[in-house]
Amino acid sequence: MTAQPQALKIRRPDDWHIHLRDDDMLKTVLPYTSQVFGRAIVMPNLALPITTVAAACAYRDRILAAVPQGHDFTPLMTCYLTNSLDAAELVNGFEQGVFTAAKLYPANATTNSSHGVSDVKAIYPLFEQMQKIGMPLLIHGEVTDAAVDIFDREARFIEQVMEPIRQQFPELKIVFEHITTKEAAQYVQEGNRFLGATITPQHLMFNRNHMLVGGIRPHLFCLPILKRNIHQDALRKAVASGSDRFFLGTDSAPHAKHRKESSCGCAGVFNAPNAIPAYASVFEQLGALDHLEAFCSLNGPRFYGLPVNTDFIELQRVATTQPEEIAMGSETVIPFLAGESLSWSVKA
């Protein structure tokens, strides 16, 4: 029997999907990301969405001002696509190096997505421009038709929206974000080099039974919602395969405790404090620790055409109990796996 490794050294990872929020929440949550990750794709769905170069620059400045001294972190900004977005603004932002990618939210699919796109085909001209300049499209892949069951919305999105986009724009770089189903995993695996996907730690570790059996666990509620175990298993097999189509995207999405624990709680899991140890635990369970570095640190930069980070982090086999809550002024935020123990930790 092979001895278990006591330490792992991997190239510094990047987070290809994160919500940093703004104001006090930004200042509270950012250090958990900036101390471990070199870069992060920052979601643009603030209360006032990021739809202009000026707004992206201002938000980037607020993020950089909140980075603790000694952390070397680069936020990668995204543009929120709307029905009326000016193509010139999108192109200029990308060519100036302000926008790294553009984000497609189907209207009302998730938090702060009411400004999202109601008719995807109406913004095909934007996709044409993006394909021409090599700008990646990041997609929250769920239909929002009220007649479609919430557990079926991702699979339905593939046939109704994703495949038509890819047929029309075969060389448009697309990230199918936070995939949650066996259909999505298979679709990405069978795709080409223009299609990639991010996978969160919660969708690898849990399924809907964990959220709903024996009482509702609101801090596991996120969108896309946790699915049944056959889908969880498909995601685990996808990352264990070593395929370079899949890469790290935490979708860390913090909300104040009272907004999660309410009669109509918000969707989002705040996993930034322990994402890397959580991923490491999953990869170890799958006997796939040799693929952890590629998933965390190599596949994403390769897809985006960016250099990999030059420095490294070290994980240690030190069991660590996760905090029950994190203070944010007079409020608190509940982290992923609160009060539970993980067998890996990132060396400070």
From Swiss-Prot:
It catalyses: (S)-dihydroorotate + H2O = N-carbamoyl-L-aspartate + H(+). Pathway: Pyrimidine metabolism; UMP biosynthesis via de novo pathway; (S)-dihydroorotate from bicarbonate: step 3/3. Homodimer. One of its GO terms (molecular function) is zinc ion binding. Zn(2+) 2 binds at K103, H140, H178. Catalyzes the reversible cyclization of carbamoyl aspartate to dihydroorotate. The modification N6-carboxylysine is found at K103. Keywords: Hydrolase, Metal-binding, Pyrimidine biosynthesis, Zinc. GO terms for biological process: 'de novo' pyrimidine nucleobase biosynthetic process; 'de novo' UMP biosynthetic process. This is Dihydroorotase. It holds the Pfam family Amidohydro_1. Belongs to the metallo-dependent hydrolases superfamily. DHOase family. Class II DHOase subfamily. Its cofactor is Zn(2+). CDD domains: DHOase. It comes from the Bacteria. The lineage of its organism: Bacteria, Pseudomonadati, Pseudomonadota, Gammaproteobacteria, Enterobacterales. Its EC number is 3.5.2.3.
